[in-house]
């Protein structure tokens, strides 16, 4: 049976984009999509229609910096990189996510 990707939970696209850019470095949107897919071994496939609005929101909040440049294929592309505020936000969100996963694990396993 073929393995399918996991559903992207509401509110996680911004978190995934921040993580991709924090660890993968400066990238344009399509590279962010590819990085998330490859790094998650295909388990997380973000749609373009979800990613680009998320990148715009992150940029507006000052968590990403963006600039136009020419891509490897000779096309104009908007490149993103994480700001110091974005790194702080990623750290805080990572802690919250770890806490959430641990709490769900306790409930599912019936731990007290």
Regions found by a protein language model. Name each.
Residues 59-76, 81:
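Beta-hairpin "wing" of winged helix-turn-helix
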Residues 7-50:
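N-terminal helix-turn-helix DNA-binding core of bacterial DNA-binding proteins
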Residues 22, 87-112:
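Amphipathic alpha-helical dimerization/coiled-coil segments
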Residues 6-7, 55, 111-112:
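Short, contiguous hydrophobic alpha-helices characteristic of membrane insertion segments
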Residues 51-58:
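Basic amphipathic alpha-helical segments that dock to polyanions
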Residues 1-11, 93:
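Intrinsically disordered, low-complexity serine/threonine- and proline-rich regulatory segments
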Residues 82-86:
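Accessory beta->alpha helical hairpin/"wing" motif in late/C-terminal subdomains of nucleic-acid enzymes
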Residues 19, 34, 53, 91, ...:
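A cross-family signal for key residues in well-ordered alpha-helices
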């Amino acid at each position: 049976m073929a393995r399918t990707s996991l559903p992207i939970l509401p509110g996680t696209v911004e978190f995934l984009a921040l993580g991709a850019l924090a660890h993968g470095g400066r990238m344009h949107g399509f590279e962010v999509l590819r990085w998330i897919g490859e790094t998650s071994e295909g388990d997380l496939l973000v749609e373009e229609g979800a990613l680009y609005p998320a990148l715009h929101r992150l940029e507006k909040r000052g968590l990403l910096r963006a600039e136009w440049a020419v891509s490897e294929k000779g096309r104009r592309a908007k490149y993103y990189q994480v700001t110091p505020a974005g790194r702080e936000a990623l750290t805080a969100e990572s802690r919250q996510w770890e806490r959430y996963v641990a709490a769900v694990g306790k409930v599912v396993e019936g731990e007290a």
